[in-house]
Amino acid sequence: MTKVILLIFIRTFYGENLFVAYVVIKKCSKKIDIQTNTDKINSNFVAYLITIKLYTMSKENIEFSDAKALGLNEEEFEKIKQLLGRTPNYTELSIYSVMWSEHASYKNSIRWIKTLPRKGGCLLTGAGEENAGLVDIGNGLACAFKIESHNHPSAVEPYQGAATGVGGINRDIFTMGARPVAQLNSLRFGNIENEHTKWLLRRVVKGIGDYGNAFGVPVLGGEVNFDESYNTNPLVNAMSVGIMDKNDMISAIAKGKGNPIYIVGSSTGKDGIHGATFASADLTEDSADDIPSIQVGDPFQEKLLLEASLELAKTDAIVGMQDMGAAGIICSTSEMSAKGESGMKIDLSLVPLRQNNMEAWEILLSESQERMLVCIKKGKEHIVEDIFAKWDLNCARIGEVIDEDKLIFSYKGEVVAEVPAESLVLGGGAPVYEREYVEPEFMEEYKHFDINSIPEEDVDLHDVATFLTGHPNIASKRWVYEQYDSMVRTVNMTTNKPSDAGMVNVKGTNTALALTTDCNSRYVKADPEKGTAIAVAEAARNIACTGAKPVAITDCMNFGSPYNPQAYWQFVMSIKGMGEACRAFDTPVTGGNVSFYNQTTIAGKTEPVDPTPVIGMLGILSDKANHVPLCFDRKGDVIYLIGESADDINCSEYLYSYHRVKKSPAPKFDLDFEVKLSKLLQVLAAKKLVKSMHDVSDGGLYITLLESAMPNNLGFDITTASEFRTDAFLFGESQGRVVVSMDEDQEDDFVDFMMKEKIPFSLLGHVTKGELRIDDESFGFIKDAKELYDNAIGKIMEK
């Protein structure tokens, strides 16, 4: 009866907004013992997103307490008053709160981001100048690519959080005029034995799969890792790659007095309001109450928007176009205006809505998905209107360009906000901070590990091999990728012959693109500068192992709070390591994303995730006939190791998970050698001196050999190097090593070439029919190892 009375009250007070009713019940249930199940919330509810706090904050007399509630500090509140020459109203305050959030302004990171190499090479745009990086790939074509995070939304509502992350990153690509051809993702979850982790994993993977499969872009690669530091704060990083004519780029700009402004795509609702602010704060025990900040995606609507946008891009009607992502209309209008050194007059009454009685600030800040803002040449209005009518999408003229630095928003005949466009944007009036940073005291503990503390004679090599083969961080991610479509658009070159990077066939040319995402957060936690340089180097190794040349990167920086000096030190050192490595490889940074506040506060204790700077790298293979797979080809082929091993088990999965030694230095790494190795691998491919190449990384040499053998159900017979500990040789993760194989009749040419190059290499052994042999001992057969490797994660998920 109490519940019925409560619902009647809510229905009367809040009208038809069922989600507000849900939130009220949820809050009241804590006091009147009504049982609600927030984990099983119907996704239809999410269409009615808005919190009580924001819904009722429409007061006239704005004070600092209101600004603080929206995430602004006192200094920023005073700066806003100074910029406007008055106290802002609530709508204006909301505008600044989202545009000056870390998610939109990069106010705590831009000072360091600017130190990265941001131009040169094959880049057609500088970093951050457009919605995504753009690289010349030859034949008059360009590749647009970018990676971004959707961590906080995925922690609270994993299905929609992951799905809209995929949708948003694809819009960044096609808003430039490029057709998306490939997706990758980098995912981090907590202990996989934990039921909450399993729930997050299921929902995130389903969200990515459902959206991407329906949208029609293949997933060609990525990574999934598990560690307890991500128990309550998963990381969901999505990367999209598109191809276009390099002369047809659409810029995110608005200029030309009187040129009309259109909003196109889906209708606007209350979902995602203050999503940018939500992404710029810590996760807490009450973060489930922020489900209203999560966006809701529709991949079928996005597919229509893609086709309409690309059709419009081929006309002469368009001035500029911008995706409506974080901060919605206000972000798109301010960024396009600032870039064009202009302003806009916008009538919010003209915005197509899917919910009644929306306030002006709600329309401005809504992050409803599948929407674009388009600036059209005056007199060409019929072109955009006809195209979007053809695709059955909204196309509403909501304003025009003005020749002054102002954004003037009106609603129902009344001006509700008037702010300078330049004052809102990154690189303009948005604040820039240089935070305090200090090396954490715990770093000293990582420096004192001694390999002799692990007696070699006590190690059962067979047991370690089995343990690592079935470990969730090493084993096949088949359970994940089988839920993704990898064949749509028929561009995937690695279906039958997997390689160290995803490969895109650029149809109509001899060119292929190589794509990868890489990061080992254990290395970064042990040494942020070195660990991030290793992430860049491993990405370059993966690209080069296919035969392609690394050309550029995009990055996704996942860290704790910038107000924590120790977490900020990790970020600063990581940027330094990335910059050094990118300069060495001549792979400029095209753009990316910084995601701070990846930490959870529970019972007053704040736990950050391990620092995770994910590197998305693009490579170009100028002749796709030179593509090299990772898999052994046939029995009798010769196996060599390029690079030097070491008595090094630092930060390895073997040391961390098998021996449970959580603190050790980052593994052996030589950046200069990595650059030489990358160039060498490209030449080996071009000269066709090898049949397979696979880099040594997580799990060490043994796992590299196993992964090379499994695709064709082959085995290996190798001899370890007597000068090193056998466990270090097989399971250590010292960097700069690659396993290659070749026909016996290629061996002499390979050896002669390597001797001339003066790059260390050594004979390991040969490919067998299926047995795994090391130092004349049998380690079993490939059939059994493959069964364990392929099904380990699936069996855990089914428990």
Task: Give the ranges of each region predicted by the language model.
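Short, positively charged and aromatic/hydrophobic N-terminal segments
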Residues: 4, 12, 16, 21-22, ...
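Glycine/proline-enriched, intrinsically flexible loops and inter-domain linkers
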Residues: 57-799
